[in-house]
A protein has these predicted regions:
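DNA major-groove recognition helix of helix-turn-helix/homeodomain DNA-binding modules
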Residues: 45-60
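Conserved hydrophobic/aromatic packing and binding residues within compact polymer-binding modules
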Residues: 7, 21-22, 32-35, 61
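Short, charged recognition helix plus adjacent turn
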Residues: 62-77
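Alpha-helical DNA-recognition elements
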Residues: 38, 49, 67
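Recognition helix of helix-turn-helix/homeodomain-like DNA-binding domains
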Residues: 26-41
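Short basic helix-loop element that most often maps to the first helix and adjoining turn
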Residues: 5-24, 49, 75-76
Length: 77
């Protein structure tokens, strides 16, 4: 599965619109739409914010694993 499929699927699973996610990422909707279509590379800061928002690991977002659970949070971080 491609990365852009993951971000679209997560958004749809959480019943969010592209406009809502674009606002969360502080970007124009058209820019976010290009990320979801795979027409533009998404910056790492946006990937990290999406992982936090959806509470999934970065590995899941980029397709390295199918395990949707996030990494445990450590108090020393």
């Amino acid at each position: 599965m491609y990365f852009y499929h993951r971000i679209r699927d997560l958004r749809e699973d959480h019943d969010k619109t592209q406009r809502e996610i674009a606002k969360y990422l502080n970007m124009q909707v058209t820019v976010y739409q290009r990320y979801e279509r795979g027409e533009r590379e998404i910056p790492i800061w946006a990937v990290i914010r999406l992982a936090c928002y959806y509470q999934v690991s970065l590995d899941y977002l980029v397709g390295l694993t199918d395990c949707i659970k996030p990494y445990p949070m450590y108090s020393w971080i």
